[in-house]
Amino acid sequence: VKLEAITWQRMAERLAGHLDAPSEGGGPWQRVGIDGAPAAGTGVLAAELADALRQRGRSALVVAAGGFLQPASLRFEFGRQDVDTYLGGWYDTGALWREVFAPTDPGGTGRVLPDLWDPVTDRATRSPYAQLPPGGVLILHGPLLLGHWFPFDLSVHISLSPGALARRTDPSDHWTLPAFARYARESGPQSTADALVRADDPRHPAWTGIRER
């Protein structure tokens, strides 16, 4: 895979420019997925992209997948370090479809719920809905996003080598490392994403650019 050195800001500008290009058959809203393990810092690129879009006069709404965790009773049903549950049961994908994607489908309302569950209090956040106007861009970021057939108009996977992932993951979360290895094998985010970013050193990312499909 050929990679080009680039800054996060320049990457965001390139992504924003791609989203500005006219496309056939698109709805009133565009959906972007920025996928990567927690150690990959997907929120950094999400914020940079939102800023780049706003500078172009576009509305942008950033949603973190971490705001859609399942209640603790479901996440820890089979123990606090169950890899299978982490892969398939930690994130409330049904709520993401219902509260994030359905409102931004053609004919949707644009009323997006920015988060649903607070894992610290283990209670609903009760956040108000955010209104994303037509022409706006929804940016969803977080781990394990590319294995659910989410309808992204543009997807980015931030990849870390196994060594970098282990170094940058808190030791208390090292039990999740096999989950990300399985995700890489089974869902193939490095090949399915529209753009692949290598960020072993977050100060010096490199990427493929936006790949033609």
Where are these regions (language model features)?
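Post-Walker A helix-loop "phosphate-sensing" segment adjacent to the P-loop in P-loop NTPases
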Residues: 51-61
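Conserved beta-strand scaffold positions in the cores of enzyme catalytic domains, especially
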Residues: 31, 60-62, 153-157, 196
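NTP-dependent small-molecule kinase module
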Residues: 1-18, 22, 158, 163, ...
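A glycine- and Lys/Arg-enriched "phosphate-lid" helix/loop adjacent to the NTP-binding pocket
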Residues: 80-87, 150, 154-188
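Glycine-rich phosphate-binding P-loop
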Residues: 33-51
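ATP-dependent NMP and nucleoside kinases share a basic, alpha-helical "lid"
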Residues: 123-169
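Conserved nucleotide-sensing/catalytic segment adjacent to the nucleotide-binding pocket
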Residues: 61-64, 70-122
